Amino acid sequence: MRERDRWALWLPVFFALGIGVYFSLDFEPPIHITASAAGLTALLAVYLRRSALFPAGLAAALAVAGLFWAGFHTELARAPVLERSIGPTEVSGRILRQNRIEGPVRVVLEDATVSRLPPERTPERLRLRVASLPPGAGPGARISVLARLEPVPQPAMPGGYDPARRAFYQGTGATGFGLGHPRLLEAAEDRGIERLRHGIAARIGKAIADPAAAGVAIALTTGLRGDLPRAAHQAIRDAGLAHLLAISGLHLGLVAGLVFAAVRAALALWPGVALRYPVKKWAAATAIAAAFFYMLLAGATVPTQRAFVMVALALLAVMVDRLEIGMRLVALAAFAVLILEPYALTTASFQLSFAAVAALVAVYEWLAPSLSEARSRLGRAPFFLAATLLTTIVATLATAPFAAHHFGRIAAYGLAANLLAVPAAAFWIMPAAILGTLAMPLGLEAWPLAVMEAGIDAVLWTAETVSALPGAVRRFPPMPVAGAIAAAAGGLWLCLWQTRWRLLGVAGLAAALAIHAGARPPDLMADSDARLFARHADGRLYLSKTRAGFLGRV
């Protein structure tokens, strides 16, 4: 009972438990049964509200509600999906997104028509690779192209990344590639934010000559990563810096923090305003607006939406004079994300981001009483370096089990690379990106983007140097699902409780390590036609083909 005030932190955990059960099932539970069960358990929780069993009843109600909600969201997302390859066939549709400005480009088409499919069997969205786009084509334009369409790929191996599941919840029912050059059928509609994204990307591409630096700048500013050269992308991954390219909480937090500080400092220059009005709240409201605009500019993907929820809740706490940014805020953000997008629970981005944030907040709550003394004792610069080191270590350790589960690889020198790259991104690259974007309407973006390019060059040099070190990348069999679940349970127990019994969470982490250590890679895998084999005998994987995927293991 000593930690009764922490019980509420477990509410999203039980809701997530129900969602996790849904996605672990190999059959679709009838929606009317899960809805009835959710209603009955909710009534039971209400009945037990004055009983000592109320916490257990509420936990059960939330778990069943999560099971129902995941199924309900699946029904809402259900749409036609291509079941077999077809083509050549004429495909037309309106461009929803494109991943780059020029050259070979991947586009997502909505409102699609396929000449060889009836309307009721035509996917609502298609993802195509085409050699180029015709002049004047962009988001909102309608194009037509001769293409070959394929079903969305299944996991490459059992338990691996499932592109078909992700595509299902994004409304994408087929992939394919163009067999010729697309034709423009209708000019682009006025889709302001998409045209703005690509306009900013084009201006950056003209201002920064180096392709690698330009690709990173475009990715950080607009979320478009198609212009980043493959070699640079690989070096960034191998150095453990890939998170810098994926616009998430780090980036939105930096933008919101910089805007908040700038607006508050500017308003403080007028004593008559600063003394009479709540300028801090005005700055927080402006920062929320800036973060929302940045989310739209980055494509409003699920990770950026999740990050915006976190940032907005933190700034709303400032506006209502609740300055403590604690674990309740993290729990509320997780609840909001799971309600909006239950599928997010299964994604690497959700697991990595919330693992890092929860661990950082838990460590902050533990160290909060001594932070002021440490800052005065060390001085500003040493304290900042120590805080950066601690933040990097905590985030790396917290995300390691989930990175092992999803990727089966670690960047051995990622800690050192992040200690150099993250401060450069926070205090050099992102401020220059904001200034450059704001200066574009005046045509004055060249100088801020030159400063941004210099910072990106430093990060790229760090990535290339670190990734070239011997043993920079360590590969191993992915952690089994059971290990990831044990790590999540242990980590949550450590982070959500505050008394000594939180240390029982170490048992969950130890179990995760034991499960991972005992996992044995398959000796033999075969595709659905039994034409592709892989044998693990000397630690290597031997493939007869490289295009198919594995469906079973021996």
Where are these regions (language model features)?
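Non-globular, low-confidence helical/coil segments that flank catalytic cores
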Residues: R94, P119, S132-L146, R166, ...
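N-terminal leader/targeting segments
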Residues: M1-V81, G192, R306, V481-A482, ...
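Membrane-interface helix/helix-cap signal primarily in integral membrane proteins
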Residues: R2-D5, V64-H243
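Hydrophobic alpha-helical transmembrane segments in multi-pass membrane proteins
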Residues: L40-T41, Y47-R49, P55-A60, G176, ...
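Hydrophobic alpha-helical transmembrane segments of multipass membrane transporters and ion channels
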Residues: L9, V13, A209, A213, ...
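Alpha-helical transmembrane segments of polytopic membrane proteins
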Residues: I31-G39, L352-S353, N418-P423
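Divalent metal-coordination and catalytic microenvironments
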Residues: G18, G93, A147, L220, ...
